[in-house]
Structures are given as C-alpha cells and as structure tokens.
C-alpha cells in the first residue's frame, strides 16, 4: 500500500463551526520522489522506494550517491520503501513526484514514527510498577522492583520479565487517525490526535488498513 514520508511539526487544536475542539498534529509532507521500482523478477517482491528533502552529496558514501545518480533523482535525506501488489506497481515510475493528492479520497491513515527516547529507566517509570512502602521499616527500597523469580526451580529469570532498561526510541504505529484537513499549497496534513516522536522527526503515512467505522 503506497504512502508518503512527512515531518512532524507539532500539535495544535482546531474548532468546528459547532464549537467542537479537536487536537490535531501538523505534518509537513514535501515532495516525495521515486528512486527505485522493485519487482519480483529482480528483487523477489514488489515495492516502491522513495526519498524526500535535499541532502548535500558530501554527506553520503559513493555507493549512495551512485544510487541517486542512476535514478536521476535529487539526493534526499533518506530512503523508504512501500510494498505494493503486482497490479498497483504499474502506476508508478522512477523519477515520479508524489504529494498529498495521494490522500485526496482517504479519510483515515496509519502513521509510523519513532517514539521519544527516555534513556535508562526504572520499573516504576518504564512499566508503571507500584512503589513500596514509604516508611514502616523500608530503607532504600522505595522504587525497587521486588522479586524477579522463584527458587532453584526454575533457577533462572524468565525471558520478557519486566525490569529496568531503555525506554522509548522504538518504532510505533498509530492506527485509524482521522484526516481533518489537507492543504496542498502549504504541503501540510492535519490528523486528529497524537503522533509518535519529536517535532521534526520523520513520519510514514499510509492509508488505514483497518477502516472500521468509515
């Protein structure tokens, strides 16, 4: 399913004529340029590879520069792929430009981003563990996780045990966000609700897979 690459600008709110307020995320979607068409005969699957933005050539390795020169497309800030079916792959070609007109008839979208990294966190912040007693004999164990296993049997800590560790900085998908407004002149799309990641982060926008209630 074809999508677009955008950049999260931040959040705001808009009011309807009836006075209803909606929190929305503003996403800037600049020109997406197709750099490669992947086919089953050569790559064992159908996909469209795109780039967006402009990047200086001295920031790239020679193989990366050669990839852009071969496609005849301006060097972008990254490469992203969208897997497609055999029938829809013929609608695209190398060098083609894509914009928000792709979503002109779409009501809901799925958005993929990278969540905010929080660094190393304890179990209270990371997994919402309950803290131990503030007093009543407790010393230096107010935010300790407690027991992490049993005895000689099984004699190990089970995989997946909720413990302290790195929080955030994961690929996160938010599904079924309503498209509130599309402005082709300013190259922005407003979607209802929050989107993962920092302002300025790259966002993948796709038509919603689960179109419940549409």
UniProtKB/Swiss-Prot annotation:
Post-translational note: Methylated by PrmB.
Sites of N5-methylglutamine modification: 152
Key words of the record: Methylation, Ribonucleoprotein, Ribosomal protein, RNA-binding, rRNA-binding
UniProt entry tagged with the keyword Cytoplasm: no
Intrachain S-S bonds: none
Stretches for region Disordered: 134-153
Any one cellular-component term (Gene Ontology): cytosolic large ribosomal subunit
Functional description taken from the UniProt entry: One of the primary rRNA binding proteins, it binds directly near the 3'-end of the 23S rRNA, where it nucleates assembly of the 50S subunit.
Family, as annotated: Belongs to the universal ribosomal protein uL3 family.
Record-given protein name: Large ribosomal subunit protein uL3
Species annotation: Buchnera aphidicola subsp. Baizongia pistaciae (strain Bp)
């Amino acid at each position: 399913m074809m999508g677009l690459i955008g950049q999260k600008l931040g959040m705001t709110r808009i009011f309807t004529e009836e006075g209803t307020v909606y929190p929305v995320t503003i996403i800037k979607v600049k020109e997406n340029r197709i750099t490669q068409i992947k086919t089953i005969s050569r790559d064992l699957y159908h996909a469209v590879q795109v780039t967006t933005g402009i990047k200086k050539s001295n920031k790239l390795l020679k193989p990366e520069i050669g990839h852009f020169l071969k496609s005849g497309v301006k060097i972008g800030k990254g490469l992203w792929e969208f897997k497609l079916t055999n029938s829809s792959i013929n609608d695209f070609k190398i060098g083609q430009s894509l914009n928000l007109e792709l979503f002109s008839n779409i009501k809901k979208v799925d958005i993929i981003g990278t969540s905010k990294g929080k660094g190393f966190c304890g179990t209270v912040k990371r997994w919402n563990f309950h803290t131990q007693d503030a007093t009543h004999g407790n010393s230096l164990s107010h935010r300790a996780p407690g027991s992490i296993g049993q005895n000689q049997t099984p004699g190990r800590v089970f995989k997946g045990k909720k413990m302290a560790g790195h929080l955030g900085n994961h690929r996160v998908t938010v599904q079924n966000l309503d498209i509130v407004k599309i402005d082709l002149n300013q190259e922005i799309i407003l979607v209802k609700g929050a989107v993962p990641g920092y302002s300025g982060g790259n966002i993948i926008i796709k038509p919603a897979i689960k179109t419940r209630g549409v």
